[in-house]
UniProtKB/Swiss-Prot annotation:
Its EC number is 6.1.1.18. L-glutamine binds at D67, Y212. A motif ('HIGH' region) lies at residues 34-44. It is an enzyme of class 6 (ligase). The gene is glnS. Monomer. PANTHER family: GLUTAMATE--TRNA LIGASE, GLUTAMINE-TRNA LIGASE. GO terms for molecular function: ATP binding; glutamine-tRNA ligase activity. It comes from Vibrio vulnificus (strain YJ016). Keywords: Aminoacyl-tRNA synthetase, ATP-binding, Cytoplasm, Ligase, Nucleotide-binding, Protein biosynthesis. GO terms for cellular component: cytosol. This is Glutamine--tRNA ligase.
Amino acid sequence: MSEADARPSNFIRQIIDKDLADGKHTSVHTRFPPEPNGYLHIGHAKSICLNFGIAQDYQGKCNLRFDDTNPEKEDIEYVESIKNDVSWLGFEWDDEICYSSNYFDKLYEYAVELINKGLAYVDELSPEQIREYRGTLTAPGKPSPYRDRSAEENLALFEKMRDGGFEEGKACLRAKIDMASSFMVMRDPVLYRVRFASHHQTGDKWCIYPMYDFTHCISDALEGITHSICTLEFMDNRRLYDWVLDNITIDCRPHQYEFSRLNLEYTVMSKRKLNQLVTEKLVNGWDDPRMPTISGLRRRGFTPASIREFCKRIGVTKQENMIEFSSLESCIRDDLNENAPRAMAVLDPVKLVIENFPAGEVENLTVANHPNKPEMGEREVPFSREIWIEREDFREEANKKYKRLVLGSEVRLRGAYVIKAERVEKDDEGNITTIFCTYDSETLGVNPADGRKVRGVIHWVSADKGVPAEIRLYDRLFTVPNPAAADDFASTINPESLTVMNGFVEPSLVEAEAEKGYQFERMGYFCADSKDSSKEHLVFNRTVGLRDTWAKIEAK
């Protein structure tokens, strides 16, 4: 199979293949242009993987460009966060980072060119009046009384705007296109507005700022972008994209292509809704592991490879659809099953005493870090007379389907011996406080010599050497597949999206790296929290369970 055959195919790549074959372009140049007014989420990851992935596969270039034309909502904090997210996902931008603000002087010149051609005018209608004059989807708009000013007058007024001679909302520059167009975006859209706001790149040089639709296409052309790829909500904007480039003097002529945005079940992607979750403290910040932000997914334990694989699996189409959350979970589960070292942790502990094991003695057992990858090495796990096991792994009575520890029966401890439950001790309320067992000292790594069958295998942690840990069990943030469709999306938040437990982990996990994935035997995949975990207070986040438990719930 050739390298080209191995690439994922989609309609955008087919367009690129044809453009190259026809000689329309000799190379491919894409861009990822986020606005630095928030944190990137999994939907942005799809665009990142698409644009940077195309550049990689076609030996082309991809620019990271910040669409920084709205200084009131933007911050250098978001610039740094976005750079970190793109880099963490495994991509490198071409040359230096680009900013739309780098082109403010050129954009101003192109606006002047449109004015000179009679294709732009300064409007002094209020924002409310502009909306009123624009009309509706079923009724045409009506022209502004300022629409037919001369080029000379418009140039003077535009210069006055630039020099701070108008208050905010008192004047704007509009394109002169068609107030009766069936496309609202073509009804004399605003190109520049007055904003007395300091900019994180240009400081106080400007008090007028260009709109996205005017900036975007010109930035693409100035950077030599061959394929400008965006989501479907910008389909109508392509008409304005083309109109601007058709009416200014510029060499490069990029074209815009649209694909469907990512809609993921049990989450929201709207920046406004995500911001509401944070500001109303419904979650613990933008990097809360329940959030769909890249920083949140990273803190939860998702790997760059798993997110790239997810974006590859869902593909690129023009069809709007809702992707199952289990598809994302499947990608990280596959990744960690293959690559995560194993460890033992007890989340809901009950004490177990092995009465015939020497008191005060600790035996260091050698356990493989991965059952199928000997190259991942081994570790020592301390074994002692008193250990912790999961409360759910013991019953006084059980049917034959229960393959764990039952009073009077045997079970194997993972990586250790076969034990038999002899008796229990309870508190005044009837809760089991201690399980007393005996062990077969001849069963380390081998089956019982007499051939007797053992019911199953359970995990454990030494009570003497185990380390206390806070365990955070994360689940889906919402209880319904499409919370954005609810009248009050916040009312659909899952009250069990976070459960905190206090358990014990094997001592090797004291050295666990933040965000590095581990499979806690029989419990799921976890990582040390990057913000709250320390050697003095271990905190582990559940990334995903061993199996898709929601599939069973939804099937009922």
